[in-house]
Amino acid sequence: MKKVVKLNNIKIGNDLQFVLIAGPCQIEDEDHALFMAEKLIQLTSKLSIPFIYKSSFDKANRTSINGIRGLGIEKGLEILSKVKSEFNCPIITDVHSESQCTDTAKVVDILQIPAFLCRQTDLLKAAAKTGKIVKVKKGQFLAPWDMKNVQTKLEAFGAKDILFTERGSCFGYNNLISDMRSLAIMSELNVPVVFDATHSVQQPGGRGGSSGGERKYVELLAKAAISVGIAGIYMEVHQDPDNAPSDGPCMIKLDHLESILIKLKKYDKITKEE
């Protein structure tokens, strides 16, 4: 039986309607978080797409020491808690160390393990021990079949609900490429799989002191991934991405999201009717 992860009234599975995980790269302030959450909830409700709000309190792996990291865990969780109570929507955010897991799990519904940290055993253990859903991004350096080892670790530590995410693989210097076979390979582990359409177009360190990106390919890759048959699409979204504090070149402009989602719904329906 294929694994389905249940979150409130949302069912996440590779054979089910895709779930959208979306929000701004980092939490900028309370007003912005509430604004983005409201707009995304209105849009996904209109299109009948299950939705999970995403934003980060700390971007701990910025390219440069001068990169804006975010508001930090205390203020960040306070804002995410406000979003959750205001809109009654599920929340996902990143954790970067074992010490962050317990406090973060008190607020959010899903703990996300960043790609660079996907093999960190103690972090996986701490996340699993919270009892929350754990979503792990496959490292840019990792083969998809090697995610079996991540799955085994999490299950050994008691994790019941696991999600895996594809976010591109290193392709030479300052570049990533998306191998859509990865989605099928990770699905064979009986884990719901999500495609990160925005980080997959990232050009790591491509601007010297910051990462670049090719936003124009986000929709193309998202449609390709949905056509494989997956559980979810992950996209970072901003009303003014070119002036966002992080990952601007990769993020989708809020005004463009609806047209993309309408197309993704069509691709998803065709794929899962076969």
UniProtKB/Swiss-Prot annotation:
InterPro entries recorded: Aldolase_TIM, DAHP1/KDSA, KDO8P_synthase
Coiled-coil zones: none
UniProt EC number: 2.5.1.55
Pfam short name (any one): DAHP_synth_1
GO biological process: keto-3-deoxy-D-manno-octulosonic acid biosynthetic process
Pathway: Carbohydrate biosynthesis; 3-deoxy-D-manno-octulosonate biosynthesis; 3-deoxy-D-manno-octulosonate from D-ribulose 5-phosphate: step 2/3; Bacterial outer membrane biogenesis; lipopolysaccharide biosynthesis
Keyword list, A-Z: Cytoplasm, Lipopolysaccharide biosynthesis, Transferase
Subcellular localization(s) per the UniProt record: Cytoplasm
GO CC annotations, alphabetized: cytoplasm
Disulfide bonds listed in the record: none
Any one Gene Ontology molecular-function term assigned to this protein's record: 3-deoxy-8-phosphooctulonate synthase activity
Reaction(s) the record says it catalyses: D-arabinose 5-phosphate + phosphoenolpyruvate + H2O = 3-deoxy-alpha-D-manno-2-octulosonate-8-phosphate + phosphate
Primary enzyme class: transferase
Entry similarity comment: Belongs to the KdsA family.
Record NCBIfam families: KDO8P_synth (TIGR01362), PRK05198.1 (NF003543)
Protein name stated in the entry: 2-dehydro-3-deoxyphosphooctonate aldolase
Species name: Rickettsia typhi (strain ATCC VR-144 / Wilmington)
